[in-house]
């Protein structure tokens, strides 16, 4: 049980120790991202929970900042990931991506990222109160792409690792590397100087640590883990050592013995191994069990799949419970507890994303309910980098094929452009900004300057006229009681604005700062002592008001001759209870100069460490009211308002009406008078703080330049509970005010303040500008201006062009000179068009308006450049006539040339030459034909187009300077010329005798719709009996009564053409009885509907005689196929034929075939043609060879039917043949217009016009490039080789470098290019893909001088430097070196210069400058910080670029952005006054230089007479001072530029210029001047000191006794004591002797002044105010006389002080007096008759009548020793020689075991009974003595002197022992007796020793009596108990004694 209590105590001690500060553990790791210079950094830290009060997992906490190693840093806001409530720590993590500067290709750069702060735990056995420094080595590698770049190692540890003192402890640092697992090395850190725990080693290969601590306590350690490429991380944690009781190993000689260290186990066989403990544990700690991952194990987690692991631990004791604590768990892990109790199990699960790739080391610890812990278990979760991220797979080409919106360039680890986040979501709209895209982006739109809104579509600008007073921007602080704390407000003129202020005040304040200002010049030390004594009550009372209360302390002294206005003692956050106790006032006086108000003014404005977001109170304690003038009172009030500090004033024992009046007048604060008691002032001060915190008082700061704009404040009120409300502050800007950048400060007294920067409208500005334009050209321009308030500007012309100069039109085409009062927007584009050939310079002027006010006017100068004008041509239209030549007369003109110098070129004659001959001077016209005046051409049409058409032929004129005109057209109108039809019919036509037949007349025409048939002539037979007629049903010759007989010149009605064929059937009958050849005939023509008549056709008629006839037989044509649109007819001809059994009709052997083939049904999808003449087949003598031609575009099956008839018109059956038309691929076609462009044209994309009958895709290519003209493909890529594919069948042109144009640059170029196209088809029969015909296209470039181009330029330079710069300008005609600039305005905040000096208004108006000629120098001290928003460019100028022809670019601007280079500024005191022997808190606050970003400090030197400390406020843990031992010492840990130090002068030294401190302030690479703070150590009257020297007891020995470690005077009853002491004072101004007084007169005894040695008693000191004068020897004396006859311990106490001339009192020294009784020695009485005995051996004799007495021993014990000694010496004889016995009774006795001796302790009566009878028997004859020794043990003396006041008495009885005179006697008797005596002596010694030990326990006597060595000798002589008592009278402490022994 005792051991358990012991261990619990040790454990609790460690808990207390570990609360000393807040840092526990840290490590930093990093990983690359898809951009090599964007590094993801992860910081894992552990802190003490109590520093934050309490934390919860997932909570956000902030602490310190991280330095990225590139002069940038950021504050850390971390997420709590785990916590240990038993040991009161938690872990937190921060992760962020930092962008480092890009590196050149294939280069690396190393950075060190650091998290550093102070201070470590004070009680560490190493590194106590030192900085912690957590770092990682980062490598930026531009040579590799993600994910191949290096990653840092990753490690982890429990924040506190428990180890056993004096035993070997083993634990392992587990680390993992995403790149290579076996390449890590381990060692103690070398990145920061720190002490490692002694006895600890680290294995460099596997991270095994061995530690044999020899002390209990806490150590810190830091291990560095480095990979093969040099990237490193560290892990910093604590080692807690404790002692544990175990047992020794069985191999030891003291096996199973209890032990606490290995060294206590001896002779063990396994000694010497650093891995084995010979002292092993008794209790078994809990252990991790399966399925917990093994130590060092790596678990792979796949991406996008849920994975899990378990932690399970168990204690072997059923009565205990187990719990698991983890460190730095990834926030994505989900936790589930699966079991609790003796076994504890938890489950973690995770479905990681690609963004989580990396390694995560998890550390865990198992604890049982008794406090025993397991070893640390660490393992790794590893999320592997796949070859392709986010679901991508590797393709056959080795590249990643990504899904979704992941980018193959980054192996699917990065989003494509336009997407963001871990799911690559589409970026939302971002109209005027840059979207934060990419896998690490959040999709938010980062707006360009002037835009806001989620999509940056809302302009920050608006018209001044529409603007209302509003908040432009504001800053809130979470910890503030009021918000916003800063705001920018726009105030419209003469309009009041109510500014909202939100108050959020909890019932218990969250933060409270109390600065205690104490009057150090109280009227007495006792008065000031009440301040000391009341401090703890004050602190504890005030702490109840807030969750976090911090205190500071300052002092002032109103002592007139040595006043101190204000002296800081301890900054906010200090332990003021200790600080006030350490402070020693320099004076005590009721005199006062009344400077308490002045002190409060300085204290309230001093840098004492006020915390942001706290309620601020200054408590002033003074015992005298203030005296001050009105100015001082006003300064006091303004200082409090400016800092928002509320005063509480305590009149300490004195009324303070002036203070009350000021507080009442100010309207805030609290005053009260308190009694001069510790309880009253502390209670009332606390009540005052409570009172002021319950009042809301609003004040406007007088020290702010914008105070006059605050017109009203909220009414104050009292609050009693939590308050959430919004109040309003009224602001109003007068119409006219001369306040520049007004700022208002409004304080809610104590609770904080809001700073309001007030903006109002300012006049816009415009600048002079200009532009130039070529003669007869045009130019566009905009009106521009700027407005400091970002208002929307509109513009108005104030002067216009002369009407002869030209016209300026708006975008709507309206002449602006007709709109004299129109305002235009800034986006309006104006067009200037000069009058034709007008070349004079013109100007216009304009103003800008912001909605409220106009700018001053600016001028735009317009310069017209005279240039050669291109000639002009006029288009012409002619009408062509088929087969007739027509003349074409062209016309052209030129401004400079006569007609004879103008030539005309036809750009592309081919559109006309396809229809006929196009000639100049009887020669065909080509593109190179030069046509001179009079420009006469001819054209003869030879091709008849199918329909009317107009054809255009482009031509241009060229002047003598080879300048071409724009393109004109020769338009030729063609009409189609009708062609006569073709008539046909079958001839001869057979007819039977006396029979009739039908004759089919056919007309074929391709350009007509109908025809009429004309019977020109006919013969009716050789006998004239034949008849030609027509039946009403055409083709039906059976009519008789309705016959219409043909007449000559008969004209039929119109017959429509069907498939280009029209037929008319006429009838013929005969009455001939026999066969007659050419019996009759008919001749006809056909006339189309356009009046053209065909040639005549004659049809003969044969009369065939009657004969037996059989119908013929048709020969069927099998199904066959033809190709669609295929023209190779020979391949598809077929023969229609038949056979006939009648040899007259058909005899193949005789070559007779009189059959007629007849088409009975024509095909529907095509046409049958005769092979011999290509006419359409209808009927024809057999065999009839035909061709089937499908109609254009058709395909599929078609049929036609046919038969044969014999000469007797007998018909065969009708046969039908199917023709399959097979679809084929058709050749594509392509066309393109000729194109010409100028140097002023933009790049237009041109497209080829393609077509394909089959609808196939057509891909075109360039097969010949134009000369001297750059041609670009569809993607805008220059074509350098042909053939070159055009992916979109589009192209564009640009001029080559002019220098490449032949014969001369900047000349016109005419050229052509050739393209063809290929279709894309799957067809292969009869052919596959087909290529179009080559198309030659003309292209021309017309040179027009192109205006130069420029763009806005921003010149970057540093403040107070000059920068040569080059204007942005380029021109295709003019080399850059020849371009010049025209400057229209000069900079306003700097100067332009060249080699000849500074430019001025005259020089810029009269000349131009080369692009690189000028240098800009800003005015001294000016930078961008001096602009309205502290960020805009400092200066600007307007300019235009001129080419060598004088043509100008548009006007543009050069901005001069002057980077502020203002180092931080120190505005504090350069001299501080430090009070002697006083710690001075020195706060150095660096103000960020204008435009700067941070403040760091380097203390360069210190003279070192005193001591300089770095000071760290640890919150509730107080303040830590770290002495600075070497210089320079750098700090950069403050985000606000405040650095705290403390100065302490050496003791009792002072003087002006006592020390100097030099330092510089740093911002990145900016270093301030060296600042020097001079330390004056002000002499402060130091209190004197008093020292006790000695005392002398008068009436005694007179010996002077020096005071030792105590101040006690021991004196006897009825004596007196003289006390001697001395007073000292180090102050040089202490001239006279110090005064001395007795603080309190003792109640017993009397104090006298010392007179002299003869008559020592001087005057009685009855009054404590009576002074004791210093004696001539420099000492002070007094005499103390106790009351006669009285005694006592602590009889009296006399406190003494000395006092200097300033009233300062030394610390008191007290003399204690013990008045002692005189101790009376004991007396032994032996009857005279009993003083000698004679006896024989072996006989017993009784010694009697022996008594003793000790007169002053009443109830206390005394000691008696009885022994047998020799006759002449004190040697105790053995009890074997002589022995004795006594009756001990109630006494406590102890006999010696071998000697004849016994010692007894008891009351006097008890011991007298012991010695009343002593029975003696001797074995050995001889002369002996019975010795009786009595010791009073000094009990009558004070304890303090008891050891020196033992008194004793000794007496003897003589023993004469002889042997009996008998013959049988032998020597054995002597032997026996001698043995008895010897035994008795030995027994006596043992009894004495035993009694000594017993007495030592029973009653603590002095060391001299009870020393352990007293009984270690061979005899009793060495024991002081056996020292013989001398005569009592010889002892000066004895009373007189009559006893003689």
Curated annotation (Swiss-Prot):
Keywords assigned by UniProt, alphabetized: Cell adhesion, Disulfide bond, EGF-like domain, Glycoprotein, Membrane, Signal, Transmembrane, Transmembrane helix
Extracellular-side positions: 21-1871
One GO-annotated biological process of the protein: cell adhesion
Glycosylation sites: 1400, 1505, 1530, 1606, 1652, 1738, 1777, 1848, 1866, 1869
Cytoplasmic side: 1893-1941
Region (Disordered): 1921-1941
Disulfide bonds listed in the record: 430-445, 447-456
Start and end residues of each VWFA domain: 513-696
InterPro entries from the UniProt entry: EGF-like_dom, Ig_SibA-E, Ig_SibA-E_2nd, Ig_SibA-E_3rd, MEGF/SIB, SibA-E_N, VWF_A, vWFA_dom_sf
Location in the cell: Membrane
Membrane-crossing segments per the record: 1872-1892
GO cellular component: membrane
Membrane disposition: Single-pass type I membrane protein
Span of the signal peptide: 1-20
SMART domains reported in the protein's UniProt record: VWA
Pfam families, per the entry: Ig_SibA, Ig_SIBA-E_2nd, Ig_SIBA-E_3rd, SIBA-E_N, vWA_SIBA-E
Superkingdom of origin organism: Eukaryota
Positions of the EGF-like domain: 420-457
Assembly with partners or alone: Interacts with talA/talin.
Function: Implicated in cellular adhesion.
Family as reported in the entry's similarity comment: Belongs to the SIB family.
Full protein name: Integrin beta-like protein B
